[in-house]
A protein has these predicted regions:
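Solvent-exposed loop/turn segments at secondary-structure junctions
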Residues: 49-50, 243-246, 305-309, 362-367, ...
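Bacterial Sec-dependent N-terminal signal peptides
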Residues: 1-24
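Structured alpha-helical segments in the cores of large, soluble enzyme domains
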Residues: 284-294, 339-348, 383
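Active-site groove signature of glycoside hydrolases
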Residues: 241, 338-371
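Conserved small/polar residues in nucleotide/adenosyl-binding loops
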Residues: 398-404
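Short, well-structured secondary-structure segments
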Residues: 298-302, 359
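Extracellular and organelle-lumenal recognition/adhesion modules and their flexible linkers in secreted
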Residues: 22-281, 293, 298, 313-319, ...
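Surface-exposed amphipathic alpha-helices with a cationic face
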Residues: 289, 293, 329, 333, ...
Length: 405
């Protein structure tokens, strides 16, 4: 025991002496080491835990297209004053377009002295900020006759922060209506109300409410969150996933870029099965690329090599996935005279986004091929060869699991 104590005491004394010792470090500046790339530091975005809808994407209406459930209407409810009635039900006929799978039909019996309301609670509340102006838009048709108002209220509905009378003469054809509301108070848990004082039916779809956005981009991002991303000065933005790229159960649940561009009413959205909720794809391919541009960062696009969690396309049949990748690159990089470059210009961005970095697959080549992908190296080569043949300056990356590195 005494010997152990002596050793311990000696160690403590040695440590104390060492802490007071002078240490010299010689640096040979004439012999630098490996040059470190300035592009190593970047950010990665994946729609997990509502990182897009309800997060960075500025849309305030939750379940805006009524697609989140086949039977119920999550985040929406109705209310009626005494003497009024309102009924809401999902319908799947006479829809706005082929991208929309459902709409909401309201049957209303109200009057100015007894109104009826459709209410949306937003994503855990709508943030009403005094002096802030919100842009409302929605599509509607029906037989309704009477007045309509849009409001922001507190959660109980007994305090109005913003209100506007809508010039909405509802007719038989789908029509887009727009309005603005300016809040006169602050409430992080506010709600949106559409208030009716007449009678008839209204069929609604794509009800949208936007606050001001980062750099005033249409269909843009929350300025507070996007500014924080800007402040860290990332050199690249990796998107859109992650497992989000691949989806689960079927290839329809994967991220398909061409379904995420254009007007929001033309985006069908998809089931984000990996993370257990539906996404509107309002934050789509253009929005990711625009984010990278606004952050002065390079986009790093992750493409699917032909798989989804629970299934895959055989390696000898992946040409459609390669075509999808090549079309995405043409949309991002092609001239306006090209098919997809012209579509990019039509959607508001004639100048190329210039994707230089491409990640081919996500966490592929798992030890158990059934879990992810067989023949990953062959898949990688097929993609890389196709990309470099048309875009020789594009840098292709792989993302493997540890046992293969």
């Amino acid at each position: 025991m005494n010997k152990k104590r002596q050793i311990l005491l000696s160690a403590v004394l040695a440590s104390a002496l060492a802490s007071n010792a002078q240490v010299s470090i010689n640096v040979d500046a004439s012999n630098p080491g490996i040059k470190v790339s300035p592009n190593l530091y970047g950010i990665f975005f994946e729609d997990i835990n509502h990182a897009a809808d309800g997060g960075l994407y500025a849309e305030l209406i939750s379940n805006r297209s009524f697609e989140d459930d086949d039977k119920n209407i999550p985040t929406w409810k109705t209310a009626a004053q005494e003497g009024a009635k309102i009924n809401a039900q999902l319908i799947n006929k006479g829809l706005l377009n082929n991208a929309q799978g459902k709409a909401l039909q309201l049957t209303i019996a109200a009057k100015p002295a007894a109104t009826a309301s459709l209410i949306n609670e937003g994503f855990w509340g709508i943030n009403a900020v005094q002096g802030r102006t919100y842009k409302l838009s929605f599509w509607a048709k029906g037989s309704y006759k009477g007045g309509l108002k849009a409001r922001l209220t507190n959660a109980k509905g007994d305090k109005v922060y913003a209100e506007t009378t809508l010039n909405a003469k509802v007719g038989k054809k789908w029509t887009k209506y727009t309005a603005e509301l300016t809040a006169n108070g602050n409430d992080a848990k506010a709600q949106f109300e559409l208030v009716a004082d007449g009678k008839g039916t209204i069929v609604l779809d794509v009800v949208s409410l936007f606050p001001p956005t980062f750099k005033n981009r249409e269909n843009g991002l929350r300025p507070d969150l996007a500014q924080l991303l800007y402040n860290i000065h990332p050199k690249f933005v990796r998107f859109p996933g992650g497992c989000y790229v691949e989806g689960q159960e079927s290839p329809e649940n994967a991220f398909h870029w061409e379904k995420t561009i254009g007007p929001i009413e033309e985006r069908p959205g998809h089931k984000n099965v990996n993370w257990r909720y539906r996404t509107s794809d309002g934050m789509g391919f253009d929005e990711y690329l625009q984010l990278a541009e606004d952050l002065n960062a390079k986009p790093l696009y992750v493409v699917n090599v032909g798989l989804w969690h629970g299934g895959m396309t055989p390696v000898d049949s992946i040409q459609p996935w390669i075509d999808e990748c090549m079309n995405a690159l043409e949309y991002a990089n092609g001239p306006v005279t090209s098919k997809y470059g012209a579509l990019r210009a039509k959607n508001g961005h004639p100048e190329p986004y210039n994707i230089e970095y491409l990640e081919i697959g996500n966490e592929n080549n798992q030890p158990d091929p059934a879990a992810q992908s067989d023949h990953y190296y062959e898949r990688f080569k097929k993609f890389k060869d196709a990309v470099l043949a048309k875009y020789p300056k594009t840098v292709s990356y792989t993302h493997l699991t540890l046992p293969t590195i």
